[in-house]
């Protein structure tokens, strides 16, 4: 056994290092924040909001691929899929909302066009976090 050849303080150090390595490995393999998914109704911003500041401070730009979500941190990249069409788009959360009961996300006009949401205005969607931004959810 290797402990016969090492001083007691050295054995304790190696055990501490091994325990730390195991803890880091378990933390890295644990559940990821990017596993967040949500299903519900999605809609898109009205044209009247163009140029107005979002909750993050950036102005709303209809031509960008952005979204509003009530709890995901700003900067989080999510995939929004229109359940009816099967089409999806990647967007960045930069606003809070939607402020309508029963809705889980508002997307920009460009994002809405990509997933076939413009005509319907509201449709069932599925969200999946691609890359979580640092911060609270």
Task: Report each predicted region and the residues it spans.
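Secreted/periplasmic proteins
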Residues: 2-18, 22-137
